[in-house]
Each structure stands twice: as C-alpha cells, then as structure tokens.
Amino acid sequence: MAKTKRVAAFILAAITIFCLAAGVKYSGAYTLYTFATAKRKLPIYSVEREDKKIAISFDCAWGAEYTDELLSAMEKYNVKCTFFAVQFWVEKYPDYAKKIVGKGHGLETHSKTHPKMSKLSRDEIKAELTSSKAAIEKITGRKVTLFRPPFGDYNDKVITCAEELGLYPIQWDVDSLDWKDLSADKIAARVLKRVKSGSIILMHNNGLHTAESLPLIFGPLLANGYEFVRIDDLIYKENYEIRSDGTQIKK
C-alpha cells in the first residue's frame, strides 16, 4: 500500500510539473488547458471596416485567355480590383500587365516561380520576392507593395521576409472556389453568402466561369452599398494589428 501511495504521489508531482511548464491552469473541479504558445505571424485576411469597402482579387499564373472579359466586366460596373501575378506570367503577358495597371487596377507579386514558400530558406524567399517585384515594376512602372503567397502557404519566416522587403502579406477571407470550375451561379452564391465589409475575395484570372460570375457578384453587392477598391486602398498602412483570425484592425 505504501509503495502504491509513493507511485501515485510521484505521478501527481510529475503531472503538476508538466502543467506548470506548459501553462496549464487548474480551476477546481475542471482543468482548463491553456498551453502557452508564441504568437504566430499572420498575413492580412480581411480588414475591420464599417464603410462597406471590399476588395476582389485575381491570382494570375497559368493563362490569360479570360483576362479581357474580366477587365470588361470591371469597367462596365466601375469596379477596381487587384491582380497577384507570378513573374513568369508578367513576362509572358507584358501587354496584359500594362493594361491592368493602365485601367487603374493593382498588379502585385505572387512570387517568381509559384513555389511553396514555407519550404524555402530566407535567402530563397527573398530572391522570389525581389525578382518578381522588380520584374513587375520594370514592366508597369508602378511600385509593388503587396504579396500573396502561392497556395496560401506561409509561416513566420515567409511573413517576416515579406515585411522586411516592405511588402504587406495578403490572404483572403472569401474563397470563390472558381478554380474548381464551379458554375457562375455557384461561384456568385459562395461570394454573396460570405462577403462582409472589409472582405478580400479570392478569384483566379483563368477560372473557367470566373468572368461569367462577375456580373452576378457586382450587381447585388453594388446595389447593397458595397464599394470595390484595390487592396492597397482597403488595408491600413500603419498603426494597426492583426487579430488571431487574420483581421487587420486599427490600434
């Protein structure tokens, strides 16, 4: 019996030490597990705003055959947007890059080669960003200030490298899933259901039904008082913080 008590006491002591080290708090009859963890660095998923400004964005990597239709729809509805392009897309379609910027839209970096950025070293990450940034700026004559990680893949290292280069890392809070070749109606329904003031919508310039879905998105949202702006006009540039859900808020 004495041996059993000694073993039980040892186990209890070990558990107590573990809990204290891990940051576990004990509160009477229930144990509240609050493991202490370092705060993860996050990109901007959305912005806390009450003015009904939102942003629609298009990732550009593999083609351009629907880009004219996208631009026509935005011109018809007087909508501004942001394109995130990889370097090889901009170099393959320089006329589209110039056309996008010429119509008042944003053209920002989506990396040089579309890798999984979290798998790269710091030097490799910075090479991807500096090369693509320089290529876009050379072709368009417009400064690049935003970066969207390919595949939405990032870690603290990726975010830190982007920030050190003066780039705001951008994600999204509304995924249209247009890359799955959903119908225009289904794409629009997803967006309309999820959008709110300060939302950033993810789409792709080469989605099969993306261009067709735009009037179904623009019409209802504009009628409800929403305003589509470029992401660089949506986000706060200073005196801000990012909540754990990726929402950028003013301090």
Give the ranges of each region predicted by the language model:
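Terminal accessory/targeting
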Residues: 1-57, 72-81, 197-251
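Active-site beta->alpha N-cap acidic-glycine motif
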Residues: 30-120, 124-138, 236
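Catalytic domains of cell-wall/extracellular-matrix polysaccharide-remodeling enzymes
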Residues: 69, 91, 115-251
